[in-house]
Amino acid sequence: MRAIDAIHAGVGHILCSDYQPSTLIAAAFAASRLADLPLDRALALVTSNPADACLLDDRGRLAPGKRADVIAVGSIAGQPMVTHTWSAGRLVFAAGYPMVQPAAPRTPGVRLTMYG
């Protein structure tokens, strides 16, 4: 069964790779588009769901006390591309192309800030 078919059937909860993890970013965005999933649910396929399945309760989501590296994603020629990476609260990577203006957050009390 293809991953997108499993997601459509409600039985695909994790997208993972043992070879090229960078493809997971594109896979999450494709799952959102092709399976008509809200982006937060599609991103959970590559973040919180795998962490939960591996019993890694200290990571997988952005929350106080959790470990996290954070990326900002832009769209270059229709493809999601990492524009910035933060590790331990420090900017460690910035590409030479701009971030896409984010949509309003769906979570009450969450504020998005643009830098750069």
List PLM regions with ranges.
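H/E-rich (His + Asp/Glu) clusters that bind or coordinate divalent metals
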Residues: 36
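Active-site microenvironment of metallo-dependent hydrolases
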Residues: 29, 40-43, 47-116
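Short, small-residue alpha-helix embedded
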Residues: 25-33
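Short acidic/histidine-rich active-site segments
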Residues: 1-26
